[in-house]
A protein has these predicted regions:
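A short helix-to-beta-strand connector/capping loop
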Residues: 56-57, 117-119, 196-202, 257
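Rossmann-like adenosine-cofactor binding region
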Residues: 198-272
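Short, ordered loop/turn segments at secondary-structure junctions
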Residues: 101-104, 126-127, 181, 244, ...
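Conserved acidic residues
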Residues: 3, 95, 174, 215, ...
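Short, charged/polar "capping" segments at the starts of alpha-helices
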Residues: 104-108, 183-188, 247-250
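Glycine/serine-rich phosphate-binding loop and adjoining beta1-alpha1 elements at the start
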Residues: 50-147, 275-287, 299
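Adenosine-phosphate binding glycine-rich loop
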Residues: 2, 6-8, 19-57, 64-67, ...
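Glycine-rich phosphate/diphosphate-binding loop of Rossmann-like nucleotide-binding domains
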Residues: 138-216
Length: 361
């Protein structure tokens, strides 16, 4: 039996209301102070993971810091807390531990965490990129578009997920715009992309102007607040929001019935899996970052796989191959905890066609 663990944390104080309704009545500052003092702990035992080649069990480990705390508290304190989580996983018998959300971003993106543990560590970012591109391509096709005629925008293009996504998307689209707060790393990446691909490449730190012309948007920033609003997008745009917390405001889906918003990396996993914890997904599905940890465990690949600020495209392709081998698949589309059906996508397409016919843009 292979063994793995996965570290996760509340994205915001509001997430704690799912644990206890009384949290709704307590000040955020009080809850954050309590979370800072609380030690990591085992949340649940994961059973039933089984592919044609192997079986595995695992554990969820709770890191009691919100996303805001992870970027505002001293880096050393946060990294030490994540290492504590990893040591719990180690004591439980896990041979690889996965990082989620901001635990994979803080500090040097998992490298120091791995150095302080005796088990393998992965961020899950390689499979996150693979499935985000796969899902975006499929959704775009259902919307009646071909990637090779599309203008794509990657928001957060200088990060590990963003830059890897750029490298893969650039091989498929007509034009790609890289967006981030700091231009120098974008310009360096753009030069690399231009040398290796035939698509047109642009860079900018002006997100709204870039989005207005985008057929495809892949957004992967570590922003704590929404950065994409309803007025930013053109009719027919396909937006894949990989970020946690989300980059795309809920108002986009509520106010723009001519724009398709999907979440990146929702995966169907093999076996009859019981997470013994409700994180809002249907049975036998998970985030792609979680799935990467499971795939590596089933394969017996107990090595540091996706760490640091740069992702290897060869590893993205490799984890995709291993996912296919162990029967991990894209589980359709979701947005704000709801399924996005093909019928809904076709309705968005009709609304976009009508909007373009009426307004001509």
């Amino acid at each position: 039996m292979e063994k793995f663990a996965f570290i996760f944390h509340p994205l915001s104080v509001q997430d704690m209301e799912h644990v206890s309704p009384i949290m709704h009545y307590l000040p955020d500052s009080f809850i954050e102070a309590c979370l800072k003092m609380k030690k990591p702990f085992k949340v649940s035992h994961i059973t039933g993971l089984k592919s044609p080649y192997a079986e595995a069990e695992g554990w969820f480990i709770g890191c009691t810091l919100t996303a805001k705390q992870m970027v505002t508290l001293p880096e050393e304190f946060v990294v030490d807390r994540i290492v504590e989580c990893g040591k719990i996983a180690q004591e439980l018998g896990a041979k690889i531990v996965g990082l989620s959300a901001f635990t994979s971003i803080v500090g040097d993106a998992g490298i120091t965490v791995a150095k302080n543990l005796d088990i393998a560590v992965t961020s899950g970012n390689s499979y996150t990129v693979a499935t985000a591109i796969q899902g975006t391509e499929l959704a775009t096709k259902i919307m009646g578009k071909s990637l090779d005629s599309c203008r794509a925008v990657v928001v957060g293009a200088s990060g590990s997920i963003g830059s890897a996504s750029v490298r893969l998307l650039a091989k498929k689209v007509k034009h790609i715009t890289l967006v981030a707060r700091h231009l120098p790393p974008l310009e360096e990446l753009a030069q690399e992309i231009s040398r290796e691909n035939s698509c047109e490449v642009a860079v900018t730190d002006k997100i709204s102007s870039a989005l207005r012309e985008a057929d495809i948007v892949l957004t992967v920033t570590s922003a704590l607040d929404f950065i994409i609003s309803p007025s930013d997008l053109k009719p027919g745009a396909v937006v894949c929001d990989v970020a946690r917390p989300r980059n795309v405001s809920r108002e986009v889906s509520l106010m723009r019935n001519d724009v398709l918003v999907i979440e990146g990396g929702v995966i169907s996993i093999p076996g009859d899996v019981n997470f013994n914890f409700d994180f809002g997904f249907p049975k036998n599905t998970s985030y792609a970052c979680m799935a990467e940890t499971m795939i590596l465990a089933l394969e017996g690949r107990y090595e540091n796989f996706s760490l640091g600020r740069s992702l290897d495209v060869a590893k993205i392709n490799e984890i995709s191959r291993l996912a296919d081998k162990h029967n991990f698949k894209l589980a359709g589309f979701r947005n704000f905890e709801r399924a996005v059906t093909e019928a809904h996508i076709l309705e968005v397409k009709r609304n976009a066609d009508l909007s373009l016919a009426v307004h001509g843009k």
